[in-house]
Each structure stands twice: as structure tokens, then as C-alpha cells.
């Protein structure tokens, strides 16, 4: 294979040298460049093998050499930017450090992979995984991780790296706080979340809005139920006082049911299997037919102690009485309940889990059992029934209207 090389003379002409004797496997191309002003006179100059001899006097030249191609596979050519020497290195063996590279330069190159961006990502992952953490905890974990990875570093360099890691962690935490990804209160760091676009943020806010509306509805329902309980209890207290004043004596012990209580009623033909625990706090009932469970609040409502607010049939007189039984701050709620402007207050009896539970025959066929306690566990608001009054039953016509004759009470 023929190779060409050129020489620029003082007059600007390009002189071409051709060597036809170069073999294809050992071809060498050399380019010799000289400054035109440095050429004084013709003389003998020893040039590379490619050019042979020439009568050219060259005071300054730069030779760029391309060595012969490597015959062995998986080899690469390694050259120095400072010297024209080149050598071959096999790719299967780890290459030695370059002779012109300084240790400080290598160290700087290694640290380029551990910059603020790198540590920000690591710190972000740590805080996100922990949820709540501190600066020292994150820094200690990262120092331990990188120290284990760089076990070959000298102790002096390791101390420097630990200080650098802690400084980077501190900077990364400040960046994440500025981006509102994390929050810091004293020494406690909490994860907030990665920034999102407008569409995602709008969707997230809509979900949060619906969740809070559901919570508001639940709180309203609880407030309305508590108002009904207070009205029913105070109405019961006034009724019992009137009965005692008319009879001029307290009611007989066998005619009193203490609060709280649970009533289980079913047909007379129903076969009931009842098991009672030794401490008499748990009762296990098995029924072969449908039955109903009512708590004390449901019974008081059916007795009319809630002034008809639970069913929306509150008369103006009942509304006046109900408003007088609650604190002044709750009177507007009572008015709204009487008008039906607050939704979710009217609950059917023997269906709501807070007011009662009804089990069908199919539930009993599947082996459904009911565990009852004397602490009125069927009511959702049994905690507000401390030191409640007693109800006098047995001589009132209202009790006969509540339960049919073909039902029995337990």
C-alpha cells in the first residue's frame, strides 16, 4: 500500500514523497510541517524512513506518527498527549495508570461522581424511605456506605472524604428544603414529597377535597347523633321526675331498666341458644330465625324522647322543647335537623350499625353468632353515657306500642 507525505516549502509549494516499498501490514504515515520563514538554505537533513533523504534544511519540525496496526485482537492503542510514544494494551487486562496522570488529578476525577447532584439523590432516597429522620442519621449512613466502598483509601484521605460527605449532605438537605421536598423542624427532618406538575397537583387536591368532605359528613353525623342522645336523655329525666312526683314514691325495683342496655327481640317460635361467660360480660346467642338488636338510644327514639328529630316529624312545640334541652350554641343545629337541611340524620331502625343490627336467616345458616355485652357495645357512642338516668317501664302504654305481642324480649 502506497503512503504519501508532504512538505511545505518556502515558496508555498507542496512536495510529495511516495514510498512504494511499504508493506500493507506495517504502513507508517508521517507528516512533517515547517514554518516557511525558518527555511534558510537547502541542506542535508535526515528524515524518517518513509521520506528517505532530502536536501532540505529544517530548523523546527513536528512529527505525528501512527504506529503499525496491532495484529492481536482485543488490543487498543494508548498514546500520550505529552510524548509521541505509543504502546498497545490488551482489553482483557486492567490498564495501568497513565504515566502522565498525577495522583491529584485522579482523585479529582473520582470526586466528580460524588458532587451535589449525586448526594442530593442519595439524601432524597434516604429521607423518602425513612419518612422522618435527622441530619446526623443520614450523614452517618452515607459515610458508612462510601467508606465501605473506598476501603483502600488512606486514613488521611478517608477523614477528608467523611468531612466532604457531611458537607455535601448538609448542602443537599438545604437544596431539598428550598424545593419544598422536605421540611425541617429543629433537628427533625420530614419527607413532604417530590414536586409534581399542575395536573397531578390539581388531581391530588381534588382527592384531598373529597376526603375532607367525607370526614365533614361523618363529623356532622356524629354531632347530630350526640345531639339526639342529649335530647333523649334529658327528656327521659324530665319524664321520670314527673312520674315520681305523680306517684309520690320511687318506682318499684322490678319496673326499672338501667342504662345502658341492649334489647334482642324475635318471634316466639324462634329457638334461642344462649351461652354466658363466667364474668357475665359476654353473651353468645344462636338463633334459628331472624331477630333484631336495639340499643337504649334506639328504644328512646321509638318512645318519642328525641322529639321526632330522628324521623323529620318534629312539630313546632317539639322543636321548642328540643332547643331548650341543648346548649345555646347547638340550637341552630337542632333547627336544621328539624327542617331536614342536614343530610344523613334519619336512619332506619334495626338497620344502622350504630342504632341496631338485623341479621337474616341466611346469616344464621352460615353460622353467624352474636357476642353481646352489658356495656351497650352495639352503640357507637356508649362513651357519652356515664351516670345516665333510669327508665321506668311496665305501666306506660308507649312500651306496648313499641313491641308487638308476638315478640318476646331478652
Swiss-Prot record:
Highest taxon listed in the record's lineage: Eukaryota
Dimerization: annotated segments: 204-277
PTM characteristics: Ubiquitinated by the BCR(KBTBD5) complex, leading to its subsequent degradation. Phosphorylation by E2F1-bound cyclin A-CDK2, in the S phase, inhibits E2F-mediated DNA binding and transactivation.
Keyword Zinc-finger on entry: no
N6-acetyllysine carried by residues: 3
Protein localization: Nucleus; Cytoplasm
Transmembrane segments: none
Region (DCB2): 259-315
Keyword Methyltransferase among UniProt keywords: no
Biased composition (Polar residues): 82-95
Modified residues (Phosphoserine): 23
Segments for region (DCB1): 214-246
Motif DEF box: positions: 161-195
UniProt keywords, alphabetically: Acetylation, Activator, Cell cycle, Cytoplasm, DNA-binding, Nucleus, Phosphoprotein, Transcription, Transcription regulation, Ubl conjugation
Start-end of DNA-binding region: 113-195
Comp. bias intervals (Low complexity): 375-384
Entry's Gene Ontology cellular component terms: cytoplasm; nucleus; transcription regulator complex
A Pfam family hit: DP
GO molecular function, one term: DNA binding
GO biological process, alphabetically ordered: negative regulation of fat cell proliferation; regulation of cell cycle; regulation of transcription by RNA polymerase II
Quaternary state and interactors: Component of the E2F:DP transcription factor complex. Forms heterodimers with E2F family members. The complex can interact with hypophosphorylated retinoblastoma protein RB1 and related proteins (RBL1 and RBL2) that inhibit the E2F transactivation domain. This repression involves recruitment of histone deacetylase (HDAC). During the cell cycle, from mid-to-late G1 phase, RB family members become phosphorylated, detach from the DRTF1/E2F complex to render E2F transcriptionally active.
PANTHER family per UniProt: TRANSCRIPTION FACTOR DP, TRANSCRIPTION FACTOR DP-1
Function text: Can stimulate E2F-dependent transcription. Binds DNA cooperatively with E2F family members through the E2 recognition site, 5'-TTTC[CG]CGC-3', found in the promoter region of a number of genes whose products are involved in cell cycle regulation or in DNA replication. The E2F1:DP complex appears to mediate both cell proliferation and apoptosis. Blocks adipocyte differentiation by repressing CEBPA binding to its target gene promoters.
Record's protein name: Transcription factor Dp-1
Source organism: Bos taurus (Bovine)
Source species taxonomy: Eukaryota, Metazoa, Chordata, Craniata, Vertebrata
Amino acid at each position: 500500500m502506497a503512503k504519501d507525505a508532504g512538505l511545505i516549502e518556502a515558496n508555498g509549494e507542496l512536495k510529495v514523497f511516495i514510498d512504494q516499498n511499504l508493506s500493507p501490514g506495517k504502513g507508517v504515515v508521517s507528516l512533517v510541517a515547517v514554518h516557511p520563514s525558518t527555511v534558510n538554505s537547502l541542506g542535508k537533513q535526515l528524515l524518517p524512513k518513509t521520506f528517505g533523504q532530502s536536501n532540505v534544511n529544517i530548523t523546527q519540525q513536528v512529527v505525528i506518527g501512527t504506529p503499525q496496526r496491532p495484529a492481536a485482537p482485543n488490543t487498543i492503542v494508548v498514546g500520550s498527549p505529552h510524548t509521541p510514544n505509543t504502546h498497545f494494551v490488551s482489553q482483557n487486562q486492567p490498564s495501568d495508570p497513565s504515566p502522565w496522570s498525577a495522583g491529584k488529578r485522579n482523585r479529582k476525577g473520582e470526586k466528580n461522581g460524588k458532587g451535589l447532584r449525586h448526594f442530593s439523590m442519595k439524601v432524597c432516597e434516604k429521607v423518602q424511605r425513612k419518612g422522618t429522620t435527622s441530619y446526623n442519621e443520614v450523614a452517618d449512613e452515607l459515610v458508612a456506605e462510601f467508606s465501605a466502598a473506598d476501603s483502600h483509601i488512606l486514613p488521611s484521605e478517608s477523614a477528608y472524604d467523611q468531612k466532604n460527605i457531611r458537607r455535601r449532605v448538609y448542602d443537599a438537605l438545604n437544596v431539598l428544603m428550598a424545593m419544598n421536598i422536605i421540611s425541617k423542624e429543629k433537628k427533625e427532618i420530614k419527607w413532604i414529597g417530590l414536586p409534581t406538575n399542575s395536573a397531578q397537583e390539581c388531581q391530588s387536591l381534588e382527592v384531598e377535597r373529597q376526603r375532607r368532605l367525607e370526614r365533614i359528613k361523618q363529623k356532622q353525623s356524629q354531632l347530630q347523633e350526640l345531639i339526639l342522645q342529649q335530647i333523649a336523655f334529658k327528656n327521659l329525666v324530665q319524664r321520670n321526675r314527673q312520674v315520681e312526683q305523680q306517684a309520690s314514691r320511687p318506682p318499684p325495683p322490678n319496673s326499672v331498666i338501667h342504662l345502658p342496655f341492649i334489647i334482642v327481640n324475635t318471634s316466639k317460635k324462634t329457638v334461642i341458644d344462649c351461652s354466658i361467660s363466667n364474668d357475665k360480660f359476654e353473651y353468645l346467642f344462636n338463633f334459628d330465625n331472624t331477630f333484631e338488636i336495639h340499643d337504649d338510644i334506639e328504644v328512646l327514639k321509638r318512645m318519642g324522647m328525641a322529639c321526632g328529630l330522628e324521623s323529620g316529624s318534629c312539630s313546632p312545640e317539639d322543636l321548642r322543647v328540643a332547643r331548650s334541652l341543648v346548649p345555646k350554641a347547638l340550637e341552630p343545629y337542632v333547627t336544621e335537623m328539624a327542617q331536614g337541611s342536614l343530610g344523613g340524620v334519619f336512619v332506619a331502625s334495626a338497620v344502622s350499625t350504630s342504632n341496631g343490627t338485623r341479621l337474616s336467616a341466611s346469616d344464621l345458616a352460615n353460622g353467624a353468632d352474636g357476642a353481646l355485652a352489658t356495656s351497650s357495645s352495639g352503640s357507637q357512642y356508649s362513651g357519652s353515657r356515664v351516670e345516665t338516668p333510669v327508665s321506668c317501664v311496665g305501666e306506660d302504654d308507649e312500651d306496648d306500642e313499641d313491641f308487638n305481642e308476638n315478640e318476646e324480649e331478652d
